């Protein structure tokens, strides 16, 4: 889990090496701060050599809102570069690549406006998050546009995966996210390819 510092950004692989945590540096003074949050050349060299084609943003008004776990099938499989621009969230990636040594395993990171951290979730992983503060805004760049036909999901609280979600009094989910299949019910969506 060693990290590398290059220019104004620091990144580290998490316990699933393909998932990366990126921490852009902040330069502050009496006016506030400046932070470079994305540079394509740096990203392609150090994180993933992919193009990011769309930028999305969502607001979750209530604490304990769960969105996910989501992924898309080929040819619209999405890698996601996720950041929190207001509030805070518990962000999760689950490996859904059949044959992977980390299939069904998960990693997480807390992303917040304060820490400025970003999570790279490659294609072949389901992604989801839970808000830790009210009025949390998440922004994420993706490698492929949304396709309803290729949109899939995974049960957020599947005991076979065992995500250690933060404890909340109430969880807020959409009907769609409440009825996603468990890992054992999931058809083969991605095959692991060792490189």
Curated annotation (Swiss-Prot):
Isomerase found in the keyword field: yes
Molecular function terms, GO-annotated: dTDP-4-dehydrorhamnose 3,5-epimerase activity
Domain of life: Bacteria
GO CC annotation: cytosol
Keywords, comma-separated and alphabetical: Carbohydrate metabolism, Isomerase, Plasmid
Binding, substrate: 31, 36, 54-56, 67, 80, 127, 151, 176
Gene3D superfamilies in UniProt: Jelly Rolls (2.60.120.10)
Organism: Sinorhizobium fredii (strain NBRC 101917 / NGR234)
The family this protein is said to belong to: Belongs to the dTDP-4-dehydrorhamnose 3,5-epimerase family.
Enzyme Commission no: 5.1.3.13
Catalytic activity from the UniProt record: dTDP-4-dehydro-6-deoxy-alpha-D-glucose = dTDP-4-dehydro-beta-L-rhamnose
Protein name: dTDP-4-dehydrorhamnose 3,5-epimerase
Gene Ontology annotations of biological process type: dTDP-rhamnose biosynthetic process; polysaccharide biosynthetic process
Active site: 70, 140
Marked site: Participates in a stacking interaction with the thymidine ring of dTDP-4-oxo-6-deoxyglucose: 146
């Amino acid at each position: 889990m060693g990290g590398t510092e290059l220019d104004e950004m620091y990144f580290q692989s998490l316990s699933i090496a393909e998932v990366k945590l990126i921490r852009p540096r902040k330069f502050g003074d009496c006016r506030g701060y400046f932070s470079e949050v994305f540079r394509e050349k740096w990203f392609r060299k150090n994180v993933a050599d992919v193009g990011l084609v769309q930028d999305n943003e969502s607001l979750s008004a209530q604490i304990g809102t769960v969105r996910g776990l989501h992924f898309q099938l080929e040819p619209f499989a999405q890698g996601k570069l996720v950041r929190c621009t207001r509030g805070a969230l518990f962000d999760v990636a689950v490996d859904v690549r059949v044959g992977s040594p980390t299939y069904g395993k998960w990693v997480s990171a807390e992303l917040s406006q304060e820490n400025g951290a970003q999570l790279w979730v490659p294609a072949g992983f389901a992604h989801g998050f839970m808000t830790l503060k009210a009025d949390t805004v998440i922004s994420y760049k993706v490698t492929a546009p949304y396709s309803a036909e290729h949109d899939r999901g995974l049960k957020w609280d599947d005991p076979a995966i065992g995500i250690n979600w933060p404890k909340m009094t109430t969880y807020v989910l959409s009907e769609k996210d409440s009825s996603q299949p468990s890992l054992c019910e999931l058809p083969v969506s991605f095959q692991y390819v060792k490189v």
